[in-house]
Swiss-Prot record:
Coiled-coil ranges per UniProt: none
Organism of provenance: Chlorobaculum tepidum (strain ATCC 49652 / DSM 12025 / NBRC 103806 / TLS)
EC id: 1.-.-.-
Keyword tRNA-binding on entry: no
Protein name: Hydroxyneurosporene dehydrogenase
Keywords of this entry: Carotenoid biosynthesis, Chlorophyll biosynthesis, Oxidoreductase, Photosynthesis
Protein family according to the UniProt entry: Belongs to the CrtC hydratase family.
A GO term for molecular function: oxidoreductase activity
S-S bridge residues: none
Amino acid sequence: MNITTDSLQQAWHRLDAPGSYEWWYFDAEDESEGISVVFIWFVGFAFSPYYLSHYEEWKAHRRDDQPYPLDYGGFSFQLYQDGRETINFIKEGGRELFASEDGGIGVRFEGNRFVYDPLRDEYRLSIDFSFPARDRSVQASFSFRPLHRFDYHFDTDLHAGVDFRHQWVLSVPKAEVHGLLDITSLSSDKRQVLQFRGRGYHDHNLGTVPMYESIDRWYWGRTFSRRCDLIYYVVFLRGCSAEPQAVLMLLDHKTGRQSTFDAVRVSESRFTRGLFAPVHGKTLRLEAEGVSVEVQHQKALDTGPFYLRYTSLLSMMIGEEAQEEVRGISEFLNPAPLKSRLMQFFTASRVWRAGKQSAMYVLYNFFKHRFERVHRINRKKF
């Protein structure tokens, strides 16, 4: 796995090998309003049941047409309010829905676009989509302005025995974020307008084969605190008995010093699983020279057969000094279920494929929408 902070690597790589993928991830949180958002653009949608089914059928010679990443672009948006998911929109479609910024950094899927302005050192996001299955339309505009960046590179070409099939580009470890969300009911025209002012993060991932062919599992997380900003990234490579590839990045506000650690000892404990959630460690411990971090995964914000997103509690030692516990965001991924036809069937309940009818998608969103209405009514009562 390659790791880099090179800004030039943020542009679309135009990967065309069957099974290859690329995505651009932004998240932000406004603690004062209890709002957090996640935006992701995909080309070669790495979690698409349609893309991966096509890939497996082509690989098994049951289909002659090879799957091209550009035919499986997509966009997703999640909104969390007071720790509860209120919108989870995922749509994918053909190459006619996707475009990239010519000569620059930025992509578009339908009416959803991000672009990087190097003169202002700013990422501008504009969102415009309808979500009929949940009776919503969403328009939004957001600005991500980096507060600092790291300078780090790990190139597998220079390390014997390490196979490059995935690259992580840490674009913006911390950003000042301003935004406006306009959410409208399609049936009643009721509107909710949310002002956003908070902190955010942006990275970029890409790979040359489906994730389940190269990655066994990974953990990622971040926290912003008064003492430090911290990001960790841990990948257990498939078929590799060696220690996981791990990096820990720290900005110490007390000293102003940035540190990157890639000799990190990793231990997992308190393993658990859910009905449709993969086996994972609820406690993750990371130790490097002069730094140790223990991550306790707490409330699940989003769950699936291969993915979990949590609020987390981090305990840290910097040197000999114990830090106060801080809250963060953590994720876990086990891509193996992505290959399962059964799990692809269930995953299709969350993914709207343009031009494709899915009974699972209709039923899932019907019951989810009904549940949300009951929840809103009960909140008003109490």
